[in-house]
From Swiss-Prot:
Species of origin: African swine fever virus (isolate Tick/Malawi/Lil 20-1/1983)
Domain of life: Viruses
Keywords: Host cytoplasm, Host-virus interaction, Inhibition of host NF-kappa-B by virus
Compartments it resides in: Host cytoplasm
Protein name: Protein D345L
Function: Plays a role in the negative regulation of host NF-kappa-B signaling pathway. Mechanistically, recruits IKKA/CHUK and IKBKB to suppress their kinase activity towards NFKBIA.
Amino acid sequence: METFVRLFKDSPQQRSNAWHATRRTQVGGSDLASILGLNPYKSYYITLAEKANLFKKNLNHAACSWGTLFERVSKDLLELFCQTTVIGDNIHIDGTYLGYPGHSNSPDGFCHLTLGYTQQSWEIKTIFNDVCYETTKRIPVLVEIKSPFNRKIKNSVPSYYMPQIQSGLALSPPISMGIYVEAMFRVCSIHQLGWNHETNTDIHPPESMLPLAWGIITICSTQEHTEAPQDFGTLNAEAFHQLLETLYQKNQYTIHYSMPYETACPEMSNVVGYFGWKVFIFQIIPVMKHPQFLKDKYPIIQQFLHDLHTLKTSPSPMEAYEKICCSKESLLSTEDIDDFTNMLT
């Protein structure tokens, strides 16, 4: 696994300008559900128009900021709960090296997990498992992390995330299993931190269970800031959403993360504010590699890239776009969609 990750040490770093530029010319793992017709929030045609710069992406900046903030926290918790180390969380895997030019994947990382065997089945060993296993084995896995702001967490992988995971597995030959990590975080004030269910109930519904862990996110200005830091965990829902929108302007702020279970704010300069977090659900769902996935779906990727090239080279891209939209039939059958549902186990 480590040798594989080192192959891509010089690839564009995730979320860098070079990475964004590369992504505009390729079908990334996170684009796949849309072009396969599996994403209920974005279609093939919207994705095509975005990559061709026919209109700007209609991003929910608050949701993007939330996901980015808590991706780092989720990795820290995964390392703690599974006694592992996540690597390769900044690499970009170009599919050209495996014969899939134009396709790429930017994984949330890779790590080793311990599987324990008991009662005729294998399970992922965590610090919460008080089990004496008959035998154990250590395996490398691909990591995919999601931290929804409001969506209810179920004990399964949403079908529209499965293509992203299978893409990562297909472009990572040494890896035969992925894990889908989904966590439910809640905001709280600094004074609410600790082993209790207290949270900011204006931002999220109240919780009755106790948290698995907690910590602090500190926001610092890149400019000199002398005002007293604010506890953002006391904001109302509207003001907190505005904060998340503001944090999307990444060049204005730096983010610092406490270790899990800390309750004291760190001493540092230019602190604008901070807020506490608690995690109440932390699911780790195994996903096995589907050997034929990319081979079967690559023709659709090629068709998308052909359409994208048509738009970018057309003297009248809007007319070309309308023609593509009017002429194209569904690219994915009902049977294909059912297959993805069956892949969830």
